[in-house]
Regions:
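Ligand-site clamp/hinge motif
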Residues: 211-256, 397-399
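Detector for C-terminal structural segments
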Residues: 298-328, 379-388, 412-526
Length: 526
């Protein structure tokens, strides 16, 4: 048995700052950088979009907030290159029959309340996650989780090739369950990260403070405030004025807001994020011909190059071209072709009976598709409005419905949509397997669009147990081609992400898996 280690696999009462960036609490100063002297007790304000309405890590994707804000940690994590590395587990190995993974829990780690991190504590946390989360079984299903000293063993009925990578997803962050809290709301779970929650007001702000018990060295900031500013332009202006020091989810067009302002850093990364829309096959879009016609009406190249200024790659397949899973080999039978779209509609019996410019269904009833989008990402509205216009040109009537992210999740789960936009990491485990399973396996709790292809299910089962990288790649390519042939989903584009910050903020990094916003290394200078 070989051990795998590092690379194997609110508003606030006082938000406006008197200085160009952040409040500096305390007098102690340390290292000198190119931009000034590091403040050992510095404070930072970060502009974000509203995302979570509770701090319950098993609900929806709210664990991402806990991790992004520097509070939650996992057994393993991803580095800047998307490679797996140790975190709360120092090393891990798989048994010869590939049914049991063994993790050695790091010694000397404490939760923020001072309780020691033990294998038993990790087991209790993971047990809670599998008991409470609808998503957990989509990663893997343990037959047993056993703690022995500082060793944790996880067994499964079938081999799970990427089980360690699965445990890097924020859903599996480790909390201290000894507080016996069944459901966290604005009260925060006790974790091991460099920061702890001080205050959380949903849709307004969150405050985190330095974890004095942090095992990885002294965190670089005394306090960080995450301020919800959903409007993109307002977020940019807040950074420009110095009200905030970091702005997430700004776009390429915001560069113009900072022309001539040399105190701003702009980082960019071709991300693993994919923007797509589910097509609900429980309704009108259960008709393959209608889905094919819809896809062929969409000029996705124009959306990404003209409307988004080249800050995205046109969509075609489930997995972005930034991952080596056959993007260029895949054939898009439903590429942009509006004349073909009209022909498919006519042949399938969709005709404009009443002369209003929109086709009716073959039975003569009205065809109206409701397209649900959420508010916290500006580019989603751009895609949706452009798609609405393209579809009008071929006679398909689409109504846009803009809601909060939380409402969108409820509408997805209740199947209250025809089209529903989505923007996620296509490799949340560093590998696309779980992304493919979660969205297109017929048994997945997240597959509320009703897509079902028995061959896709079969290939996903094979992918789950296949350890050979080249065979995994071949399986993923075949799965993608089937999904595309079924006209299952609208793949709009794969974004380039941007991170805007004041130059006084040091050691702020972008990661392919965008789980890690606030790390212990982030500091501010005077």
């Amino acid at each position: 048995m070989k051990f795998f280690t590092k690379k194997s696999f609110a508003f606030l009462m006082v938000i406006l700052m008197m200085f160009a960036l952040v409040a500096c609490g305390g007098e102690k100063k340390e290292e000198t950088s190119a931009t000034g002297t590091t403040n050992a007790n510095g404070e930072l304000v970060v502009g974000v979009t509203s995302f979570a309405d509770t701090l319950e890590p098993t609900e929806q994707y709210f664990s991402w907030v806990i991790t992004r804000y520097g509070v939650g940690e996992n057994l393993v994590r991803f580095d800047e290159n998307g490679e797996l590395e140790p975190s709360l587990a120092e090393e891990w190995k798989v048994s010869d029959d590939k049914l049991t993974w063994e993790f050695k829990i790091r010694d000397g780690v404490k939760f923020s309340n001072g309780n020691p991190l033990t294998a038993e504590a990790v087991k209790s946390s993971l047990d809670r996650t599998f008991r409470k989360s609808k998503r957990a079984d989509g990663f893997f299903k343990p037959t047993s989780i056993v703690a022995d000293g500082q060793t944790l063993k996880i067994s499964t009925e079938k081999p799970v090739a990427i089980l360690p990578q699965c445990l890097a997803d924020p859903l599996f962050l480790i909390i201290d369950t000894s507080d016996n809290v069944e459901e966290y709301t604005t009260n925060a779970p006790i974790c091991t990260g460099p920061y702890v929650f001080k205050e959380f007001v949903p849709t307004e702000y969150a405050i985190v403070e330095r974890n004095e018990n942090y095992w990885g060295g002294k965190p670089g900031l005394a306090k960080v405030t995450f301020k919800c500013i959903n409007d993109q332009s307002t977020r940019a202006l807040s950074l420009k004025s110095g009200e905030i020091g970091v702005a997430y989810n700004l776009k390429i067009e915001n560069k113009a807001d900072f022309e001539g302002q040399d105190d701003i850093n702009i980082q960019e990364l071709k991300s693993l994020r994919s923007t797509y829309a589910f097509m609900n096959q429980h309704g009108a879009l259960g008709d393959l011909a209608l889905r094919q016609a819809l896809l062929r009406a969409l000029d996705k190249k124009a959306y990404t190059e003209n409307l988004l200024g080249g800050a995205a790659t046109p969509g075609k397949a489930p997995i972005p071209p930034t991952l080596d899973f056959g993007f260029d080999k895949l054939v898009d039978e439903n590429a942009y072709n509006p004349e073909s779209s009209k022909e498919i509609l006519a042949k399938a019996g969709y005709k404009d009976v009443d002369g209003d410019g929109f086709v009716e269904k073959p039975d003569g009833s009205k065809l109206e598709l409701n397209f649900v989008i959420y508010t916290s990402r500006e580019e989603l509205k751009v895609y949706a409005q452009a798609a609405q216009a393209n579809l009008k040109d071929v006679g398909i009537n689409v109504n846009l419905k803009t809601v909060s992210y939380e409402t969108l999740l409820d509408m997805r789960d209740s199947r209250n949509f025809d089209l529903l936009i989505w923007n996620v990491l296509a490799a949340n485990t560093g590998d696309p397997e779980k992304y493919l399973y979660e969205n297109w396996d017929s048994s997945s709790a997240s597959n509320q669009a009703g897509y079902k292809n028995e061959k896709v299910d079969e290939l996903l089962d094979k992918l789950n147990v296949e350890f050979n990288p080249e065979k995994r790649k071949d399986l993923a390519i075949e799965i993608q081609q089937l999904i595309m042939n079924d006209a299952a989903t609208v793949f709009f584009g794969y974004e380039t992400t941007f991170l805007y910050s004041n130059k006084k903020v040091q050691n702020l990094k972008m990661f392919p898996m965008d789980y890690y916003w606030l790390t212990k290394d982030v500091t501010v200078t005077e």
